[in-house]
From Swiss-Prot:
Top-level taxon in the UniProt lineage: Eukaryota
InterPro entries: Isocitrate_lyase, Isocitrate_lyase_ph_CS, Pyrv/PenolPyrv_kinase-like_dom, Pyrv_kinase-like_dom_sf
Location within or outside the cell: Glyoxysome
Protein function: Catalyzes the formation of succinate and glyoxylate from isocitrate, a key step of the glyoxylate cycle, which operates as an anaplerotic route for replenishing the tricarboxylic acid cycle. Required for growth on ethanol or acetate, but dispensable when fermentable carbon sources are available. Also acts on 2-methylisocitrate. Plays an important role in plant pathogenicity.
GO CC entries: glyoxysome
Reaction(s) this enzyme catalyzes, per UniProt: D-threo-isocitrate = glyoxylate + succinate; (2S,3R)-3-hydroxybutane-1,2,3-tricarboxylate = pyruvate + succinate
Protein name: Isocitrate lyase
Assigned keywords, A-Z: Glyoxylate bypass, Glyoxysome, Lyase, Magnesium, Metal-binding, Peroxisome, Tricarboxylic acid cycle
Binding-site residues for substrate, renumbered to this chain: 106-108, 216-217, 252, 433-437, 467
Active site: 215 (proton acceptor)
Gene from which the chain derives: ICL1
Record-linked Gene3D superfamilies: 1.10.10.850, Phosphoenolpyruvate-binding domains
Nucleotide-binding as UniProt keyword: no
EC number: 4.1.3.1, 4.1.3.30
């Protein structure tokens, strides 16, 4: 009969402290690797080890993470780039593996094509948070399968014949979209755990508020304070450390185009928050509440808000100070005073900036950032590249790479961002979204399109990606084939699909072999002693027509 006080056989109490100390030493040794030379951890090895269980699990994600780091480190040092695109499904991941050294999993694509609720929708991160990890698993399992299949094929051939066979690296590291983390810090940690368990090598997380998250190229984006996003990055690193994995964390900022922020609590955000400079106006929220109570609705309310905004003369505090300096008759050499103010106020809180302005003899300034707040309570912010740089510098010690979401494929803006970040952290790796939301034809001529990736790489953008290329290429060939098929029947399949597959040597033309039928036949034969009357690739298989 079992004892009520059974001892855990995995832990000998007399050795528990020694085992703990040994594991702490191992973690400290791990963290001393050059891989972590720029990484800041606000927690200790003791804290990490105490959160681990007794069973040590080796995650494939760790091997993939190390591989990804080696790729990006090498590319960055050479001012080169790894570039890829959003992968939809296993067929695509096997074809990408021939030519590209990383794979991207897009939250946008997953939202529209692979939600774990089966309910499609736009990129608002309102799908279950298992959605993107499940897509990572879908692709990673395919990578593992095709790697096994290829290895079996090669080892089944004489060594002298193997040079004629494919030797594709199917295990390309996967970087996935973690959106805003789908909740609080424990949600971020659980999401990170899921990604690691599913095989991701890296994840990116953005500084938007979770409940109002938008695609990077939609309006209405609401930022969280810098401190909150740093906490998310720390949560990712802590969870990966608990699991013993070198997972890459990429910090994305949406500050370039953001117009709102949840709170003014972080002084690092103060310089970018907009305030009303018209003292004659009542707070917007009060005005709107009164209008609603009087029966105003819809367009009437919008007109009232638009009129208030036009009169409010919203400005950043620094801009308000400079305007007062330039218009004040009591200030001599306004240009010099403005320069002194801007230099002294950089990075300061609003309270400190007010004190600096006063010390320079600037008249008292009316600046009220509470007055323009939205009905949800959000503060208004003037984003821009300078705002994104400010955030990127704050995130850098906690992120392996940084990405600024932008409105256009603007090389000069990309250069400004890179130079701003590298002025403080010269070794910071950068990422860039080669978005299909951009109109590339109007953005730049074709010769510049061809060199754009290379030019960005020279600035330190060592990982670049087209988020939705999988979606768009699938839509394009589907539309083209469906139209032709409806018009000319099987001729469309021959001309648009099968013949090009054969001419280009696309392995999927032999789809039975591609799917692993030969490999699975060999599994059956192994189990049945070498003979199987039901082998899928035996006599009669129609794929013989393609030899």
């Amino acid at each position: 009969m079992a004892s009520k006080n059974m001892v855990n056989p995995a832990v000998e109490p007399s050795m528990e402290d020694d085992l703990f100390a040994r594991e702490v030493a191992e973690v400290k040794q791990w963290w001393s690797d050059p891989r972590w030379r720029y990484t800041k951890r606000p927690f200790t090895a003791e804290q990490i080890v105490s959160k681990r269980g007794n069973l040590k699990i080796e995650y494939p994600s760790n091997a993939q993470s190390k591989k990804l780091w080696k790729i990006l480190e090498g590319r960055f040092q050479k001012r080169d780039a790894s570039y890829t695109y959003g992968c939809l499904e296993p067929t695509m991941v096997t074809q990408m593996a021939k030519y590209l050294d990383t794979v991207y999993v897009s939250g946008w694509q997953s939202s529209s094509t692979a939600s774990s609720s089966d309910e499609p929708g736009p990129d608002l991160a309102d799908y279950p948070y298992t959605t993107v990890p499940n897509k990572v698993s879908h692709l990673f399992m395919a990578q593992l399968f095709h790697d096994r299949k290829q290895r079996h094929e090669r080892l089944s051939a004489p060594k002298s014949e193997r040079s004629k066979l494919q030797n594709i690296d199917y295990l390309r590291p996967i970087i996935a979209d973690a959106d805003t983390g789908h909740g609080g810090l424990t949600a971020v940690m659980k999401l990170t755990k899921l990604f690691i368990e599913k095989g991701a090598a890296g994840i990116h997380i953005e500084d938007q508020a979770p409940g109002t998250k938008k695609c990077g190229h939609m309006a209405g984006k609401v930022l969280v304070p810098i401190s909150e996003h740093i906490n998310r990055l720390v949560a990712i690193r802590a969870q990966a450390d608990i699991m013993g994995v070198d997972l890459l964390a990429i910090a994305r900022t949406d500050a370039e185009a953001a117009t709102l922020i949840t709170t003014s609590i972080d002084p690092r955000d103060h310089a970018f928050i907009l305030g009303c400079t018209n003292p004659s106006l009542q707070p917007l929220a009060d005005l709107m509440n009164t209008a609603e109570q009087s029966g105003k609705t819809g367009d009437q309310l919008q007109a009232i808000e638009d009129e208030w905004m036009a009169k409010a003369n919203l400005k950043r505090f620094d801009d308000a100070v400079v305007d007062v300096i330039n218009s004040s008759s009591s200030i001599r050499n306004p240009k010099d005073v403005a320069a002194k103010y801007l230099q002294a106020a950089k990075g300061k809180s609003n309270r400190e900036a007010r004190a600096i302005a006063s010390s320079l003899g600037v008249p008292e300034i009316f600046f009220d950032w509470d007055s323009p707040r939205t009905r949800e309570g959000y503060f208004r912010i003037k984003g821009g590249c300078d705002c994104a740089i400010n955030r990127a510098i704050a995130y850098a010690p906690y992120a392996d790479a940084i990405w600024m979401e932008s409105k256009l494929p603007d090389y000069e803006q990309a250069k400004e961002f890179a130079e701003g970040v590298h002025a403080v952290y010269p070794e910071q790796k950068l990422a860039y979204n080669l978005s299909p939301s951009f109109n590339w034809k109007t953005a730049m001529p074709r010769d510049e399109q061809e060199t754009y990736i290379r030019r960005l790489a020279g600035l330190g953008y060592c990982w670049q990606f087209i988020t939705l290329a999988g979606l768009h290429t699938t839509a394009l060939i589907s539309d083209r084939f469906a139209r032709a098929y409806s018009e000319v029947g099987m001729r469309a399949y021959g001309e648009l699909v099968q013949e090009p597959e054969m001419e280009l040597g696309v392995d999927v033309v032999k789809h039975q072999k591609w799917s692993g039928a030969t490999y699975v036949d060999e599994l059956q034969k192994m189990v049945t002693g070498g003979v199987s009357s039901t082998a899928a690739m035996g006599k009669g298989v129609t794929e013989d027509q393609f030899h």
